[in-house]
Amino acid sequence: MKKIVSLVLAALLVLSLAACGSKDNASDGNPVWPTSALNVLETVWNTYGEDEKFAVAGGDFSEANAREDAPGVFDLKDRALADSELGLPETAEVDEAASLVHMMNANTFTAAAYHATGDTAELAQQLRDNIMQRQWMCGVPDKLIVAEVGDEYVVTVFGADELVDTFMTHLNGIYGVSAVHTAYDEAIL
């Protein structure tokens, strides 16, 4: 009887340890790749645990794109608004944008994703320079991170250290450190 119980317990242990093994994010074993700027932010936000989430709004302020508690599309027709709200230079070579912003204060957390139509490294530099030169009101964000995701997407995130770090942990966890190149990780002074 003891042998049977021991074998059953050993089998349960082996099965439970096997269940803890690594899993790919994609169901077919292939790495996950972004399909749009919005997809980047939605994929990251959807991996947050309930204890990590906070009140957010996404998209621009149009009726079609504004979203509560989720990322949203940011229409690029008004480039001055995209510059003011997200730090996207008006001359940047992008054809898609999406945003996810802390509902109480954008300086606490703002994330944006862009589909680059030009060089992602150049876009990352433009975004970094444009955001770092801002005059902040209602508090200064702690830090800025600009990351290239694959060959076509650039993500910016600025705000409180803990919120920015959590976002980057999820971004790297989804796309992998081989696909996410952190171009800039700087304190905002």
Residue ranges and their predicted role:
Residues 15-19:
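C-terminal motif of bacterial Sec signal peptides marking the signal peptidase cleavage site
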